[in-house]
From Swiss-Prot:
Function in brief: Catalyzes the NADPH-dependent rearrangement and reduction of 1-deoxy-D-xylulose-5-phosphate (DXP) to 2-C-methyl-D-erythritol 4-phosphate (MEP).
Protease in keyword set: no
Essential cofactor(s): Mg(2+); Mn(2+)
Catalytic activity: 2-C-methyl-D-erythritol 4-phosphate + NADP(+) = 1-deoxy-D-xylulose 5-phosphate + NADPH + H(+)
GO MF terms, alphabetically ordered: 1-deoxy-D-xylulose-5-phosphate reductoisomerase activity; manganese ion binding; NADPH binding
NCBIfam families attached to this UniProt entry: Dxr (TIGR00243), PRK05447.1-1 (NF003938), PRK12464.1 (NF009114)
Protein name per Swiss-Prot or TrEMBL: 1-deoxy-D-xylulose 5-phosphate reductoisomerase
C-alpha cells in the first residue's frame, strides 16, 4: 500500500483526494492529514481514515483537535506548526504527498516533500508561480517526481509523449515535436456579461462557477481569469515552454481540459467530465490507472464544443499574469500575493470586482525588482507585496 500525506485535507482538493482513496482502499493508506483551523472536519477525517498523524497550522486548533480525538478514542497523533508540517511532508515512511494547501502557506511543506525526493502531486499553484526555478532545480537534485494535479496541466501532461512526462520542468518540447501547448479555460461565469455591468458584480455571483465545484478564492480567480494566468505561469515552468510555445483558448464547456499541438499537424487533447477526482486519481496512480469514481463522458449528451480567443479587455488579470512572467519571479510572486489580498478584500465587500486587477497592477508596478535565489527571497517579496496590496485596498 502506498502511504499518502495530504497537505490541505480540509480543502476542496483534499476532500476530493480522500474520495479517491475511498474508491481504492486497498491501494492507499492515509499516513498524514494537514489542515489550517477546521477542527470539526479534521476530526471527522481522522475518525474515518485513522491516519498516523494529523497536523494543524494553528496551535490552538491543534489542541482542540487533540481533545476531540481523545473523546472519539482515535489514536492519531496531533502535530502543530509549520516545522512539524514540513517534517511530516518529508517523513521517511511517506511515498507521496498531495500538495493542496492554497496560497503561500503551502510553499515550505511542498518544498520539504520535493527535497525529500517524494512523489509530489502538485495542486498548490503558488509553488511554481512564486518559486518555479527553485522547485524545478530541487526536484532535479533530489529525484522527486512532480505530477501536476490542476486539470489543465494534468491534461497537458497526459497529452505529452512519455519522454516529456519523465522530464517535468526540463523537457525539450521542440526536440519531441511539440509545437504548442494549448491551455483551455471556461471563461468563468461572466464570459458574456456586458463589461459595463462588471462594477456591480457581487461575491456571490463571482463564486458561482458554471462547470467546476471549487473553493471561493479559486472561483473568483476563475471569474477574473487570474486562475488561467497563474496556470500559464505554471505551465511554462512545468513544461519548460517559451512564450511562443504557449496558447490560451476559451472553451466554455470545460470538456477538453487542454491540448498539445505537434509539428506534424496532430493535436492531442485530454477530455472528460469536469471533476477534479480524475486528475487526482491519475497522479496518485501514475503510470497506472485507478477508479476515480467519476462518470464516463457521454458523447451523445454533448451539444457542442466551442472555442473563443480570450479578450484582454474582459480579462485584464490574464494579461497582467502573462506580462509578469516576462518580468521575472519577483513580479509573479508580487502579483500572486497582491491577488490573494485583493480577492479576500472583494469577498469581504471592501472593494469592487473591477478593483481586483487595479490592486494587482499597482503592486506589480511598485515592487522593486529583486533576483529570487531562495525561499527567503520569495517570502520577503510576498510580505512586501501584501503590505502594498493592503495599502492599495485602503486607497481605493
Amino acid at each position: 500500500m502506498k502511504k499518502l500525506v495530504i497537505l490541505g485535507s480540509t480543502g476542496s482538493i483534499g476532500k476530493s483526494t480522500l474520495s479517491v482513496v475511498e474508491q481504492n482502499k486497498t491501494e492507499y493508506e492515509v499516513f498524514g492529514l494537514v489542515g489550517g483551523k477546521n477542527v470539526e472536519l479534521m476530526a471527522a477525517q481522522c475518525l474515518l481514515f485513522q491516519p498516523k498523524f494529523a497536523a494543524l497550522d494553528d496551535e490552538n486548533a491543534a489542541k482542540a483537535l487533540e481533545e476531540q480525538l481523545r473523546q472519539l478514542n482515535v489514536k492519531t497523533e496531533v502535530l502543530s506548526g509549520q516545522k512539524a508540517i514540513c517534517e511530516l511532508s518529508a517523513h521517511p515512511e511517506v511515498d507521496m504527498v498531495m500538495a493542496a494547501i492554497v496560497g503561500a502557506a503551502g510553499l515550505l511543506p511542498t518544498l520539504s516533500a520535493v527535497k525529500a525526493g517524494k512523489k509530489v502531486l502538485l495542486a498548490n499553484k503558488e509553488s511554481l508561480v512564486t518559486c518555479g526555478q527553485i522547485f524545478i532545480d530541487e526536484a532535479r537534485k533530489s529525484g522527486a517526481q512532480l505530477l501536476p494535479v490542476d486539470s489543465e496541466h494534468n491534461a497537458i501532461f497526459q497529452s505529452l509523449p512519455p519522454d516529456a512526462q519523465q522530464k517535468v520542468g526540463f523537457c525539450p518540447l521542440a526536440e519531441l515535436g511539440v509545437s504548442k501547448i494549448i491551455l483551455t479555460g471556461s471563461g468563468g461565469p461572466f464570459r458574456v456579461k456586458p463589461l459595463d455591468e462588471f462594477a456591480a458584480i457581487t461575491p456571490a455571483q463571482a463564486v458561482a462557477h458554471p462547470n467546476w465545484s471549487m473553493g471561493k478564492k479559486i472561483s473568483v480567480d476563475s471569474a477574473t481569469m487570474m486562475n488561467k494566468g497563474l496556470e500559464y505561469i505554471e505551465a511554462r515552468w512545468l513544461f519548460n515552454a517559451s512564450a511562443e510555445e504557449m496558447e490560451i483558448i476559451i472553451h466554455p464547456q470545460s470538456i477538453i481540459h487542454s491540448m498539445v499541438r505537434y509539428i506534424d499537424g496532430s493535436v492531442i487533447a485530454q477530455m472528460g467530465n469536469p471533476d477534479m477526482c480524475t486528475p487526482i486519481a491519475h497522479t496518485m496512480a501514475y503510470p497506472k490507472r485507478i477508479n476515480a469514481g467519476v462518470a464516463p463522458l457521454d458523447f451523445f449528451k454533448l451539444k457542442e464544443l466551442t472555442f473563443i480567443e480570450p479578450d484582454f479587455a474582459r480579462y485584464p488579470n490574464l494579461k497582467l499574469a502573462i506580462d509578469a512572467f516576462a518580468e521575472g519571479q519577483y513580479a509573479t510572486t508580487a502579483m500572486n500575493a497582491a491577488n490573494e489580498v485583493a480577492v479576500e478584500a472583494f469577498l469581504n465587500e471592501r472593494i469592487r470586482f473591477i478593483d481586483i486587477v487595479n490592486v494587482n497592477r499597482t503592486v506589480v508596478e511598485n515592487i522593486a525588482p529583486v533576483q529570487v535565489k531562495e525561499i527567503a527571497d520569495v517570502l520577503h517579496i510576498d510580505k512586501l507585496a501584501r503590505e502594498l496590496a493592503e495599502q492599495a485596498v485602503i486607497n481605493l
